[in-house]
């Protein structure tokens, strides 16, 4: 991505269920790599949490830690169709693994609205419905 950057979680418009966890230290379940602690994350632990964020560019993703408690997230861009993603990886049962999931990679250039929510679905191996990430990974113009 030739214009890739991290957009702050502070730009999110929280509808319900999300909170910023300052200086995140892990959940007590699953190991955490030392470079992933002490960072502010935005986190939702239950189904139905929703937020929206405006961004400018052609791609958006979530740099997250996919641990033992993550579930299936759903998102849409602008007024598009809802899509879903199981965040759980083959390492998630024992580790909050850092992972960047690119939700959209080939959007038309311009300003877009990402709506993100947690669902009531999860991987059979997961113990929860959580989602937590540190920023929005955007390919596009830096916002002012």
Which stretches of residues belong to each language-model region?
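Glycan-recognition surfaces in beta-rich domains, encompassing non-catalytic CBMs
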Residues: 1-144
């Amino acid at each position: 991505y030739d214009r890739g950057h991290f957009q702050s979680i502070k730009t999110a418009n929280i509808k319900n269920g999300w909170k910023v966890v300052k200086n995140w230290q892990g959940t007590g379940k699953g190991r955490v790599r030392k470079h992933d602690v002490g960072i502010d994350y935005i986190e939702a632990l239950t189904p139905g949490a929703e937020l929206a964020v405006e961004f400018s560019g052609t791609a958006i993703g979530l740099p997250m830690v996919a641990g033992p408690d993550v579930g299936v997230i759903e998102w849409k861009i602008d007024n598009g169709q809802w899509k879903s993603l199981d965040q759980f990886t083959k390492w998630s049962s024992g580790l909050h693994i850092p992972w960047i999931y690119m939700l959209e990679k080939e959007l038309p250039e311009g300003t877009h609205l990402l709506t993100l929510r947690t669902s009531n679905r999860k991987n059979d191996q997961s113990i929860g419905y959580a989602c937590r990430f540190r920023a929005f990974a955007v390919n596009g113009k830096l916002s002012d």
